Amino acid sequence: MTVENLPRRQFLRGKFSTLSCLENNQKQNFVGIRPPWSVENSIFVARCTRCGDCLSVCETNILVKGDAGFPEVRFDNGECTFCGKCVDACKQPIFYPRDQLPWSHKIDISVSCLTLHRIECRTCQDNCPANAIRFKLQMGGVAQPLVNFDACNGCGACVQGCPVNAITMNDLKQNE
């Protein structure tokens, strides 16, 4: 069923918004982050039952119900510890084996970073458990962030601590 052939009664009950979100998710317009070890988005959306089992076991509460009820990662709630409980709780075949990399997300620091405006801040470095963020001293200026992308595991610990929301996680596979 598409939005075009949605019965009038369901339209009036608000079903069009859920259906529209579902169609956008299936067309891979989704720009959020799925749980670690998730399969490609089109397969994920087709197989996920939106039961919420993965949400209830997430120890850091970063998994939330997103568009059309599908689980998404919100790093502003915390970081991913890669505990794998979401994978273990799911009864559907929507996850890769846990011996593979959990995802290809890496840190991206925007131009709103305080250090780029000559304001001292190192909260991202302080919060990074992988020590992937370092600061290079500048002669007569404020130290600038340097990211070791090989060390960054995409856990998102740096996101929550940033006072100006200058940090996001980007999927390197989508940028190739």
Swiss-Prot record:
The keyword Metal-binding applies. Interacts with the cytoplasmic NapA precursor. This is Ferredoxin-type protein NapF. GO terms for molecular function: 4 iron, 4 sulfur cluster binding; metal ion binding. Could be involved in the maturation of NapA, the catalytic subunit of the periplasmic nitrate reductase, before its export into the periplasm. InterPro entries: 4Fe4S_Fe-S-bd, 4Fe4S_Fe_S_CS, Fe-S_Ferredoxin, NapF. The gene is napF. It comes from Haemophilus influenzae (strain ATCC 51907 / DSM 11121 / KW20 / Rd). Belongs to the NapF family. Residues 39-68, 71-100, 119-138, 143-172 form the 4Fe-4S ferredoxin-type domain. One of its GO terms (cellular component) is cytoplasm. It is found in: Cytoplasm.
